[in-house]
Amino acid sequence: MSNSLPLRDQYLTLIDDIIQTTLKGKISSIEQVYQMLLKGITSGTGEVFELVLSDRLSIIQSQVDSETDELKKAKATRSLRAAKTIQTQWQRWQEQNKATEAISLSMREITTATADERLTALLRAIDPNQKYPLNLSQLQQLAKSLQQFATANEDFGQIAEGITHGIASWERIQVNLLNWMYEQQNTLGFGGLPGENSPWASWAKVVNSEIPQVFFRTLAVEQSALEFAQKQQGISLSNWVELTIVLQFLQRGLITWFDSYGALRYQQAYDIKAGPKLSISTFLTFAVIWSQLANGFENQAVKYSNAASQIMLQILRTFTQRPYFPLYGGIFASFSGSYLRDALDYLDAPLRSTAGTQEKARILTLLGYSQRGLGRYDRSLNFHQQALEIARNAGDKTCEIANLNHLSRTYVQQQNYSEAINYSQRALIYSRQTGDKTGEANALVNLGYSEVMEAKETEISEPEVYETAINYLEQGLKLAEKLGDLQSQALCFSSLGIAYLITAQYPTAIKYLENAFKTAQIAGDLYLQGRNLAYLAEANYHLANYEKAVYNGSLGMYLLEQIASQEWQKPASLLNIIKGQIGVDKFQLLLQQNRQKMIAIIGIDGYDYIPPLLVKYQEEM
């Protein structure tokens, strides 16, 4: 084959030569076809060959379909069979050479990029959203290839060195990846494990490289990645690449384990709520870390800032494609209140400059309902309105319906019940049209709950109004139970309990609220747990069952305050009323009688924090 021909013509000649050789009976096996392809195709040009082969197949297929002469048709059929053999062996060639192709492509992109774009090219090569991201072995090969060009450009040598050191550091961490989990069986996640008990401290002990070690120690003492960046403005390209490799593969290693059977075994042994909860926590934690690094380097090292933003968006894109992406809640299972506030603030800013995509709509959905849980209702509405528009334009009906439901819930919190009913009705219609059963269950609950709250506000006393609303709630619960959706079930039980509480049917309210609390515990939703406990306290108070009111109210107050929800003040107010009615001594006695039960849920530190929290409420009022 003449190399003076354009590449397309070279490959057309190669294909025709194989077909003609086959027709002459000179091809003895498919292996011979494969060897001819191996010899004739240049690495890195597979797309060109694939286009030429596709065109040739189409032409021959047309000849077979249109030819009327039997001899010519038979020859065309044999040619088509030969072309399909080429196609099969080409697919084999692709599979066996995709690693070489990927490395060659990455090498070419890095070495031809401008100085400011070299990191971008490297990050694109390891982006998990790509069809063939480089794995550790391929990265090692890439580093060796780049090292050969180090004399031509110092950056290539630094990138190669960073990759090599990063892989070595990750391999040291990998064998000790989960030690911290088994040492801290009752406290998982990344918010709320300070000092030597944190995963960061655990990894700092085993990594044998300065920059990753300093980074992990910074986070272990509850400083942020932003503070690390501000102290590392002169970080070398090699060190930056090393840290990138370590953090990228650390995050992926954690996610792989949390999504695996290993996590299932851990759940069975220690914590039934672990798997998805920890995966969600990991995705968001590392997204926040990269956002903070982007922020920290934006003034002095723009290329590092841009690279960090690129990684953050890659992580979020991967996260939104997971089946457990929490469209309807659950984030409060993974973070303490202060950590969550930081996460929301850091994820908000970079998303503003990102194009409107399905991924962005889903992240905005998460930000929206999280802001609602924190009591930031205007911000919640803003996020959900943005997400609604983007999801609609992206054709993501599931996300669109979720945001209609969330808008309904947020308007209920603002006591704008007509808007809440409007959005829940729209969600119900769309969910039934599209067959979104989870969306339908949530819409039924939101509609029933909104109507109960509106009837209460307008002081409607007709029982049929409440019966209709409660019927919606019961339909939603039945559907959620059928789906096995714990998050939606918890919301259904809770909404039914509140509806019966509002209508003064206290024993029935308690039954549903207790179920709501238990289901929220299994789902791992701290916000719903705290909220249900607060309403249980109110229901028991109305029945003059002060012991249970104090028990539930104290737990609810503590859990809500821990996630920074302003709703903690509601049970705090009730507890102060009870204390005033029964006296301080009796109140303290009721707390003491339930001490062991409360410690089992919130620990000794949580129990000891209840009296100071009540004092805090009184001081703030």
Regions found by a protein language model. Give the residues of each.
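Short coil/turn linkers that connect adjacent helices within long alpha-helical scaffolds
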Residues: 353-355, 390-396, 432-436, 478-485, ...
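TPR/Sel1-like alpha-solenoid repeat signature
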Residues: 364-367, 371, 383, 400-411, ...
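Helix-turn-helix repeat elements of alpha-solenoid scaffolds
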Residues: 331-347, 376-385, 420-425, 463-475, ...
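Flexible inter-repeat linkers and adjacent short helices
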Residues: 1-356, 584-621
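Residues that mark the junctions of alpha-helical repeat units in TPR/alpha-solenoid scaffolds
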Residues: 308, 312, 353-362, 380, ...
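Alpha-helical linker/edge segments of TPR/alpha-solenoid repeat scaffolds
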Residues: 449-461, 537-548, 575-594
